[in-house]
């Protein structure tokens, strides 16, 4: 039988598929899941650019890449190139998406019962705001350059 001192030092057992486990899972993986989603969107845009040659699909591909890597136009890509610019854009954008995923996880963890479905709703709201900002910035840039 355990003594009272031994009971205090033992870690509480967590039910593998319980409420605490889900909240812990959201806290640990929310940011990385958001980065993964952004990477998939970026790779989709790159595939569209690589597989098509029309102006319409080129615009769709560039918008998809810019949504996945929102710092891309901010560092001057694709007008100016260079490994440093690509590194800054990719690492900075990954940090932004990680932060958005962690923010979504933190807000969802406040609920009594948190799930990935709740995280995706919260993340969708923040991701939509970020994507709309990117699209509006690209529209302003295209208008100022005379492309629209």
Per-segment meaning from a language model:
Residues 35-39, 86, 90-98, 126-134:
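Alpha-helical transmembrane spans of integral membrane proteins, capturing the lipid-embedded, hydrophobic core
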Residues 27-36, 119-129:
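Alpha-helical membrane-anchoring segments
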Residues 1-36, 145-148:
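Actinobacteria-biased recognition of intrinsically disordered, low-complexity terminal regions
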Residues 133-148:
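Juxtamembrane boundary at the C-terminal end of a transmembrane helix
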Residues 32, 56, 98, 136-138:
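Extracytoplasmic/cell-surface-exposed regions of Actinobacterial cell-envelope-associated
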Residues 68-108:
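Short alpha-helical packing/oligomerization segments
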Residues 20-27, 95-123:
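Cytoplasmic membrane-interface segments at the C-terminal ends of transmembrane helices
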Residues 19-85:
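Membrane-associated alpha-helix detector
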